Amino acid sequence: MRTTILRALAMAGALATAASLPSPAAAAPVKYSAHYGEDRAEIEDLMARYLFAIDYFDWDAYVATFADDGELEFASGVSRGHDAIRKAVTDFSKGIGRFYHTADGKPAKLRHIILQSAIRVEGGHAWARSQWLEMANHGEGDQPKIGTYGEYEDTLKRVNGHWLFARRNVLNEFIPKRNSGPADPVAAMDAEAARVVGGKR
Protein backbone atom coordinates (compact mmCIF):
# COMPACT_ATOMS: atom_id res chain seq x y z
CA MET A 1 0.00 0.00 0.00
CA ARG A 2 2.78 2.40 1.00
CA THR A 3 4.67 1.64 -2.23
CA THR A 4 1.54 2.34 -4.31
CA ILE A 5 1.04 5.69 -2.59
CA LEU A 6 4.69 6.65 -3.11
CA ARG A 7 4.46 5.77 -6.78
CA ALA A 8 1.32 7.85 -7.17
CA LEU A 9 2.98 10.82 -5.48
CA ALA A 10 6.07 10.45 -7.66
CA MET A 11 3.96 10.40 -10.80
CA ALA A 12 1.99 13.42 -9.68
CA GLY A 13 5.24 15.27 -9.04
CA ALA A 14 6.58 14.35 -12.46
CA LEU A 15 3.39 15.57 -14.15
CA ALA A 16 3.50 18.81 -12.19
CA THR A 17 7.11 19.37 -13.20
CA ALA A 18 6.32 18.69 -16.85
CA ALA A 19 3.36 21.06 -16.73
CA SER A 20 5.54 23.84 -15.31
CA LEU A 21 8.10 23.66 -18.11
CA PRO A 22 7.79 26.15 -20.95
CA SER A 23 6.21 24.70 -24.08
CA PRO A 24 8.78 24.43 -26.87
CA ALA A 25 8.01 25.78 -30.30
CA ALA A 26 6.59 23.17 -32.63
CA ALA A 27 9.51 21.31 -34.17
CA ALA A 28 9.76 21.01 -37.91
CA PRO A 29 8.93 17.52 -39.16
CA VAL A 30 12.01 15.34 -39.55
CA LYS A 31 12.69 14.40 -43.16
CA TYR A 32 14.02 10.90 -43.71
CA SER A 33 16.28 10.07 -46.62
CA ALA A 34 15.76 7.07 -48.88
CA HIS A 35 18.61 5.34 -47.00
CA TYR A 36 17.35 6.11 -43.48
CA GLY A 37 16.12 2.57 -42.82
CA GLU A 38 19.49 1.07 -43.72
CA ASP A 39 21.39 3.68 -41.70
CA ARG A 40 19.15 3.14 -38.69
CA ALA A 41 19.56 -0.64 -38.87
CA GLU A 42 23.36 -0.28 -38.92
CA ILE A 43 23.31 2.15 -35.99
CA GLU A 44 21.00 -0.07 -33.94
CA ASP A 45 23.30 -3.02 -34.66
CA LEU A 46 26.26 -0.95 -33.44
CA MET A 47 24.39 -0.13 -30.23
CA ALA A 48 23.62 -3.80 -29.63
CA ARG A 49 27.22 -4.85 -30.26
CA TYR A 50 28.36 -2.23 -27.73
CA LEU A 51 26.14 -3.76 -25.04
CA PHE A 52 27.04 -7.38 -25.79
CA ALA A 53 30.71 -6.38 -25.60
CA ILE A 54 30.18 -4.85 -22.15
CA ASP A 55 28.31 -7.82 -20.74
CA TYR A 56 30.78 -10.40 -22.05
CA PHE A 57 33.95 -8.36 -21.36
CA ASP A 58 34.98 -8.29 -25.02
CA TRP A 59 37.00 -5.09 -24.87
CA ASP A 60 38.34 -5.40 -28.42
CA ALA A 61 34.77 -5.44 -29.72
CA TYR A 62 33.85 -2.63 -27.33
CA VAL A 63 36.49 -0.14 -28.46
CA ALA A 64 35.82 -1.11 -32.09
CA THR A 65 32.40 0.56 -31.82
CA PHE A 66 34.18 3.93 -31.49
CA ALA A 67 35.98 5.95 -34.12
CA ASP A 68 39.76 6.19 -33.60
CA ASP A 69 39.29 9.65 -32.13
CA GLY A 70 36.02 8.73 -30.42
CA GLU A 71 35.06 9.97 -26.97
CA LEU A 72 33.33 8.21 -24.09
CA GLU A 73 31.89 10.10 -21.14
CA PHE A 74 30.40 8.36 -18.12
CA ALA A 75 30.52 8.54 -14.33
CA SER A 76 34.29 7.95 -14.25
CA GLY A 77 35.06 10.88 -16.54
CA VAL A 78 35.85 11.52 -20.20
CA SER A 79 38.14 9.30 -22.29
CA ARG A 80 39.32 9.98 -25.84
CA GLY A 81 40.76 7.44 -28.26
CA HIS A 82 40.73 3.64 -28.18
CA ASP A 83 43.50 3.16 -25.61
CA ALA A 84 42.01 5.59 -23.10
CA ILE A 85 38.50 4.19 -23.57
CA ARG A 86 39.74 0.62 -23.07
CA LYS A 87 41.52 1.57 -19.83
CA ALA A 88 38.49 3.44 -18.48
CA VAL A 89 36.01 0.61 -19.04
CA THR A 90 38.32 -2.20 -17.90
CA ASP A 91 39.16 -0.31 -14.71
CA PHE A 92 35.46 0.28 -14.08
CA SER A 93 34.62 -3.36 -14.79
CA LYS A 94 37.17 -4.61 -12.25
CA GLY A 95 35.42 -2.70 -9.48
CA ILE A 96 31.84 -3.53 -10.38
CA GLY A 97 31.73 -6.36 -7.81
CA ARG A 98 31.68 -3.74 -5.08
CA PHE A 99 28.25 -2.64 -6.27
CA TYR A 100 26.71 -5.83 -7.65
CA HIS A 101 27.35 -9.23 -6.07
CA THR A 102 25.47 -12.43 -5.37
CA ALA A 103 24.52 -13.66 -1.92
CA ASP A 104 27.80 -15.56 -1.60
CA GLY A 105 29.84 -12.48 -2.49
CA LYS A 106 30.69 -13.33 -6.09
CA PRO A 107 30.45 -10.63 -8.78
CA ALA A 108 26.92 -10.55 -10.15
CA LYS A 109 26.14 -11.24 -13.79
CA LEU A 110 25.23 -7.92 -15.43
CA ARG A 111 23.05 -7.51 -18.49
CA HIS A 112 22.44 -4.16 -20.18
CA ILE A 113 19.23 -3.55 -22.11
CA ILE A 114 18.57 -0.75 -24.56
CA LEU A 115 15.00 0.47 -24.86
CA GLN A 116 13.64 2.97 -27.38
CA SER A 117 16.00 5.00 -29.56
CA ALA A 118 15.38 8.17 -31.55
CA ILE A 119 17.94 8.43 -34.36
CA ARG A 120 18.59 11.39 -36.64
CA VAL A 121 20.75 10.92 -39.75
CA GLU A 122 22.14 13.74 -41.86
CA GLY A 123 24.56 12.54 -44.53
CA GLY A 124 27.63 11.02 -42.88
CA HIS A 125 26.64 12.23 -39.41
CA ALA A 126 24.02 10.93 -37.00
CA TRP A 127 22.66 11.63 -33.54
CA ALA A 128 20.79 9.32 -31.20
CA ARG A 129 19.04 9.40 -27.85
CA SER A 130 18.26 6.09 -26.18
CA GLN A 131 17.01 4.87 -22.82
CA TRP A 132 18.81 1.97 -21.16
CA LEU A 133 18.65 -0.11 -18.02
CA GLU A 134 21.01 -2.48 -16.26
CA MET A 135 19.99 -5.71 -14.53
CA ALA A 136 21.98 -8.14 -12.41
CA ASN A 137 21.36 -11.25 -10.32
CA HIS A 138 21.91 -9.40 -7.07
CA GLY A 139 18.36 -9.50 -5.76
CA GLU A 140 17.09 -11.65 -2.90
CA GLY A 141 18.05 -15.25 -3.58
CA ASP A 142 20.19 -14.08 -6.51
CA GLN A 143 17.06 -13.10 -8.42
CA PRO A 144 17.40 -10.52 -11.22
CA LYS A 145 16.98 -6.93 -10.13
CA ILE A 146 17.19 -3.60 -11.93
CA GLY A 147 20.33 -1.86 -10.74
CA THR A 148 20.21 1.45 -12.55
CA TYR A 149 18.97 3.16 -15.69
CA GLY A 150 19.56 6.24 -17.77
CA GLU A 151 20.05 7.61 -21.26
CA TYR A 152 22.66 7.50 -23.99
CA GLU A 153 23.49 10.71 -25.82
CA ASP A 154 25.24 9.68 -29.02
CA THR A 155 26.97 11.42 -31.89
CA LEU A 156 28.00 9.10 -34.70
CA LYS A 157 29.88 9.38 -37.95
CA ARG A 158 30.40 7.18 -40.96
CA VAL A 159 34.01 6.01 -41.26
CA ASN A 160 35.05 3.98 -44.32
CA GLY A 161 31.42 3.06 -44.92
CA HIS A 162 30.64 2.05 -41.32
CA TRP A 163 28.80 3.90 -38.55
CA LEU A 164 30.87 4.41 -35.39
CA PHE A 165 30.47 6.40 -32.19
CA ALA A 166 32.14 9.78 -32.41
CA ARG A 167 30.95 10.46 -28.87
CA ARG A 168 28.84 8.58 -26.35
CA ASN A 169 27.69 10.24 -23.15
CA VAL A 170 26.24 7.78 -20.64
CA LEU A 171 23.73 9.49 -18.35
CA ASN A 172 22.65 7.77 -15.15
CA GLU A 173 19.46 8.85 -13.40
CA PHE A 174 20.82 7.78 -9.98
CA ILE A 175 23.94 9.94 -10.07
CA PRO A 176 23.69 13.67 -9.23
CA LYS A 177 24.67 15.88 -12.18
CA ARG A 178 24.74 12.79 -14.43
CA ASN A 179 20.98 12.53 -14.92
CA SER A 180 19.06 13.56 -18.01
CA GLY A 181 17.28 16.63 -16.62
CA PRO A 182 13.70 17.75 -17.29
CA ALA A 183 13.94 18.75 -20.97
CA ASP A 184 12.97 16.42 -23.82
CA PRO A 185 16.29 14.86 -24.96
CA VAL A 186 15.00 14.21 -28.47
CA ALA A 187 14.15 17.89 -28.95
CA ALA A 188 17.69 18.75 -27.82
CA MET A 189 19.09 16.21 -30.28
CA ASP A 190 17.10 17.67 -33.17
CA ALA A 191 18.26 21.17 -32.26
CA GLU A 192 21.89 20.02 -32.18
CA ALA A 193 21.53 18.32 -35.57
CA ALA A 194 19.91 21.43 -37.03
CA ARG A 195 22.79 23.61 -35.81
CA VAL A 196 25.40 21.31 -37.34
CA VAL A 197 23.57 20.91 -40.64
CA GLY A 198 22.81 24.63 -40.81
CA GLY A 199 26.45 25.49 -40.19
CA LYS A 200 27.55 23.44 -43.18
CA ARG A 201 25.32 25.23 -45.66
Predicted regions, residues:
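C-terminal segment of classical bacterial N-terminal signal peptides
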Residues: 15-24
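Generic alpha-helical structural signal
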Residues: 44, 48, 83-86, 90, ...
